[in-house]
Amino acid sequence: MFVDQITLELRAGKGGNGVVAWRKEKYLPKGGPYGGNGGNGGSILIEAVTNMYSFEEYRNLRFLKADDGQAGASNNRTGRNGKDLVLKVPEGTLLRDAATGELIHDFTKDGERIVVCQGGRGGKGNVFFKTSTNRAPTKATPGKPGEIRLVELELKLIADIGLVGFPNAGKSTLFNTLARTEVKVGAYPFTTLHPSLGLVHQEGMLYQKPWIMADIPGIIEGASQNRGLGLDFLRHIERTRLLLFVIDISGIERHSPEQDLKILMGELLAYKEELKDKDMVIALNKIDQLLPDEREERVALLKQQFPDQEFILLSGLTGEGVDALYDLFKSKLSE
């Protein structure tokens, strides 16, 4: 199950109590204080990792707690420190304070790690309080409580390529072709109910780092006002390096391709105007359903209405035009 938002209560460990104890040896009838300090409570850390793409493993949890520190002991022994708890999250995770909405950290790289809740300090045993004037202190202090924090985790996928389009534009079929995977495909709206990630290898570049591609669930008119799957998934578009708009040029499923493209771009810019500066390519999909003359006519109309856009013709079903798309990825993403 894809989970890209979650709220958790994080509880760091309590420090162990210091103890009052006395040195008791056969030839030291008046032995002094011998109580040790408590161990520190475990802290909670969050670390970004690759190969993790949602918060699914945390979805049934309400809170997470680190270990408490152990109490001190006689013979001036310090209690064991509580074990830290490290939460793994995907790259692209935003960590916020749930109470204030304050952004605590934006995890963008593998291995980034921060302390979110500090463990409590261990209490002091009576050895700590021994002085020249108080050689037999009876005082010890309890451990400090660990920090407690309610946090929100929000994921914005980091991908090289983001596939964007209306439901049934053929995104999932194209995704399967490019990533050589099997995303569910069907002739009804919202076949893709959550973002899917795949690796795109071009023939002849198997020893190079593949591109990460995200199939974003179908966007509908009004998505920027949270219609359909709306804002839940529009945020995943923000961090992709290249947006690949997938438009059904056949016009069979919906209204005209030019109207689809106009609405789609309008929704993205209504969500966040800064997206206009992102690199975009328009993939005119399902050309296998058109005769050559029909293709030329519709492409000419689109280029007339969108003269500044870059178009590529292809068929995710038959593979026609896919090699040219690979070449385009290479030129765009190698810059």
UniProtKB/Swiss-Prot annotation:
Keywords: Cytoplasm, GTP-binding, Hydrolase, Magnesium, Metal-binding, Nucleotide-binding. Residues 159-334 form the OBG-type G domain. Disulfide bonds: none annotated. Residues 1-158 form the Obg domain. Its EC number is 3.6.5.-. GO terms for cellular component: cytoplasm. Its cofactor is Mg(2+). GO terms for molecular function: GTP binding; GTPase activity; magnesium ion binding. It is an enzyme of class 3 (hydrolase). HAMAP family: GTPase_Obg (MF_01454). An essential GTPase which binds GTP, GDP and possibly (p)ppGpp with moderate affinity, with high nucleotide exchange rates and a fairly low GTP hydrolysis rate. Plays a role in control of the cell cycle, stress response, ribosome biogenesis and in those bacteria that undergo differentiation, in morphogenesis control. PANTHER family: DEVELOPMENTALLY REGULATED GTP-BINDING PROTEIN-RELATED (PTHR11702), MITOCHONDRIAL RIBOSOME-ASSOCIATED GTPASE 2 (PTHR11702:SF31). Monomer. This is GTPase Obg.
